[in-house]
Swiss-Prot record:
Superkingdom of the organism of origin: Bacteria
Single Gene Ontology MF annotation: metal ion binding
Alphabetic keyword roster: Hydrolase, Metal-binding, Metalloprotease, Protease, Zinc
Chain span(s) of sequence motif JAMM motif: 173-186
Pfam families named in the record: RadC, UPF0758_N
Name the UniProt record assigns to this protein: UPF0758 protein Mmwyl1_0624
Keyword Repeat recorded: no
GO BP annotations, alphabetical order: proteolysis
Keyword Transcription: no
InterPro entries according to UniProt: MPN, RadC_JAB, RuvA_2-like, UPF0758, UPF0758_CS, UPF0758_N
Species assigned in the record: Marinomonas sp. (strain MWYL1)
Amino acid sequence: MSIKHWPEQERPREKLIQQGAGALSDSELLAIFLRTGTQGISAVELARQLLAQFGGLRSLMSASREEFCQGLGLGDAKYTQLQAVLEMSKRHLQEQLMRETVFASAEHVRTYLSSQLRHSPREVFAVLFLDTQHRLIRYQELFMGTIDAAAVYPREVVKAALQYNAAAVILAHNHPSGIAEPSQADISITDKIKRALDLVDVRLLDHFVVGDGLPVSLAERGLV
């Protein structure tokens, strides 16, 4: 049955207007994004099938272009639309945090880093550069690929910190597997970067590992 024949309170768009986006299921939110279904399949049913195919919303949103376009009813138009929505969300959150004290609590940092890194299909090493009040000066993704001593150069972090006149930095990287447990390589590179930053009087406040769930803080584990 077409969605237009559903009771009004069950239609995703009307439900969002009446109850807010938080009241919608993943499939209902995705149905609004899709707008239409395919022949004989409503947008909500198509959304359910896609979530089952990709293994959930996270996997769908972080899929590569090739993987995404293999989904029923999906193509380049929907892929570019999704990327635009994700980028707008990132920029909106960054604008908010530019006006706030980033390190007022670790939760501010966790929220921001989750939005930036959780959906990336590859490993990304990023740095938050902060002023003396711990306000965000700049977020920059410095390295891509496997995070180890050969891929991350402490001097590049120091160079960028001096360029932005940062008083402190927060490191972050994601684990595309979704498992946010820090590795020995993560701990080792954190120590190397901390010692390099100490030489130029820039504080390393923390290093977060982003996966599914809450990002893990190395500082909270006594590893910074």
